[in-house]
Amino acid sequence: MKKGIHPDYHMIDVKMTDGTVFQIRSTWGKEGEQMALEIDPLAHPAWTGGTAKLMDTGGRVSKFKNKYAGLGF
């Protein structure tokens, strides 16, 4: 591989919605930083069978529902 053209690949901490933390190698952030997830397999309806509540960050879900209200979504 050529030197100096690839991003730094280092260890970061990932914090799940339930508070658990695990380490993973990534190009995100800097060595030792923590990435806090808003949606993960524990809180996403696709993996929970619809039992988890979807968080409306930025009003995107509300905007979608209002835009397509007449279609029965």
From Swiss-Prot:
InterPro entries: Ribosomal_bL28/bL31-like_sf, Ribosomal_bL31, Ribosomal_bL31_A, Ribosomal_bL31_sf. Part of the 50S ribosomal subunit. GO terms for biological process: translation. Keywords: Ribonucleoprotein, Ribosomal protein, RNA-binding, rRNA-binding. It comes from Cereibacter sphaeroides (strain ATCC 17023 / DSM 158 / JCM 6121 / CCUG 31486 / LMG 2827 / NBRC 12203 / NCIMB 8253 / ATH 2.4.1.). SUPFAM superfamilies: L28p-like. Binds the 23S rRNA. One of its GO terms (molecular function) is rRNA binding. Belongs to the bacterial ribosomal protein bL31 family. Type A subfamily. The gene is rpmE. One of its GO terms (cellular component) is ribonucleoprotein complex. Pfam families: Ribosomal_L31. This is Large ribosomal subunit protein bL31. The lineage of its organism: Bacteria, Pseudomonadati, Pseudomonadota, Alphaproteobacteria, Rhodobacterales. The keyword Ribosomal protein applies.
